[in-house]
Amino acid sequence: MLQPKRTKFRKMHKGRNRGLASGTDINFGTFGLQAIDRGRLTARQIESARRAITRCIKRQGKMWIRIFPDKPITQKPLEVRMGKGKGNVEYWVALVQPGKILYELEGVTEEESRAAFKLAAAKLPIKTTFVNKMVM
């Protein structure tokens, strides 16, 4: 699963997921899966969607993952009293804003990529849409 090799600090503030997305254009492939909602995608969800796409396109074409889980989420163990510091890092998430391109595909037909992205979208907790590159 995806997670940073090393970070400057082990734990991070919760923060807020506001603002506009960067990475709203298709830069590498021909077709893309674009987020409509804002939310948090865990490393497990990103990997699950990646597996769904690769199994659907059967090793033809090329895929790019445009998001990376770089925010640690901490949790305290069950039945632990309040206080005594921040909990341990349990998993990593990527913060996603509307318009962000999540995955890109190239070298497959539009029908195949639509089918692959439909399977991947079922694994994700946010609404997504299919986009293709505008050739000008």
Curated annotation (Swiss-Prot):
Cellular component, GO annotation: cytosolic large ribosomal subunit
Keyword Ribosomal protein attributed: yes
GO molecular function per UniProt: rRNA binding; structural constituent of ribosome; tRNA binding
SUPFAM superfamilies from the UniProt entry: Ribosomal protein L16p/L10e
Keywords tagged on the record: Ribonucleoprotein, Ribosomal protein, RNA-binding, rRNA-binding, tRNA-binding
InterPro entries: Ribosomal_uL16, Ribosomal_uL16_bact-type, Ribosomal_uL16_CS, Ribosomal_uL16_dom, Ribosomal_uL16_sf
Gene Ontology terms: biological process: translation
Domain of life (superkingdom): Bacteria
Pfam families attached to this UniProt entry: Ribosomal_L16
Binding partners and assembly: Part of the 50S ribosomal subunit.
Family: Belongs to the universal ribosomal protein uL16 family.
Stated role: Binds 23S rRNA and is also seen to make contacts with the A and possibly P site tRNAs.
The protein's name: Large ribosomal subunit protein uL16
Native organism: Buchnera aphidicola subsp. Acyrthosiphon pisum (strain APS)
